[in-house]
Regions:
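Surface-exposed, low-hydrophobicity beta-strand/loop segments enriched in small/polar/acidic residues
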Residues: 1-177
Length: 177
């Protein structure tokens, strides 16, 4: 996953493993993606920004901005572990740019939305393809719409595909709650 919201494996945070919260079902069997609700899911810790691991095919240390779910990590000769290290942008006040899946009305500004469910077939050479689900805004969702990103190529808020700036909803982020 690349640029996707990330939470800890369980709602207590005791596991310490990252999970992709943009999938419809997360590793802790909670809802993710469009089903995320801050009152019932593991709270978000940030946005995935790459991983370091030993490539299982080449046995070489590797950094990748995106990691497919099918990726198998090789054994690290220094630690004898097959774990990778995930890097997460965890500043709870960080703003992000995301494409909207529908028109963003004036009334939608300040509202909260989730990302649409991501599937493996959506992968585009390591680039994020997630979109903000504008059709189902609710106060317990992941991201709050802040403003238009003012991207000259994608700033028509009356059409799907406009870039908008979002920030974590304080009730959905582990560090803002």
């Amino acid at each position: 996953f690349k640029g996707n919201p990330v939470s800890l494996e369980d709602s207590s945070g005791s596991q310490g493993y990252l999970q992709d919260a943009s999938f419809s079902t997360t590793d802790d069997t909670g809802g993710g993606g469009v089903d995320f609700a801050s009152g019932t899911e593991a709270l978000l810790v940030g946005v995935f920004n790459g991983a370091f691991f030993v490539d299982n095919t080449t046995n070489k240390p590797t950094f990748a901005n995106s990691v497919a779910a099918a990726q198998r990590f090789g054994t690290n000769p220094n630690t004898n572990s097959t774990d990778g290290i995930g890097f997460v942008n965890d500043d709870p006040h960080q703003e992000y740019i995301i494409k909207a899946d529908a028109a963003v009305t004036r009334a939608a500004h300040g509202q909260c939305g989730n990302v649409n469910d991501f599937t493996a077939t959506d992968a585009k050479n390591g680039q994020s393809t997630i979109t903000l689900d504008v059709g189902a805004l609710a106060e317990d969702h992941m991201f709050r719409i802040v403003r238009s990103a003012e991207d000259p190529e994608n700033e028509d808020l009356t059409a799907a595909g406009a870039n908008v700036v979002v920030a974590f909803n304080s009730s959905a982020n582990l560090y803002l709650k």
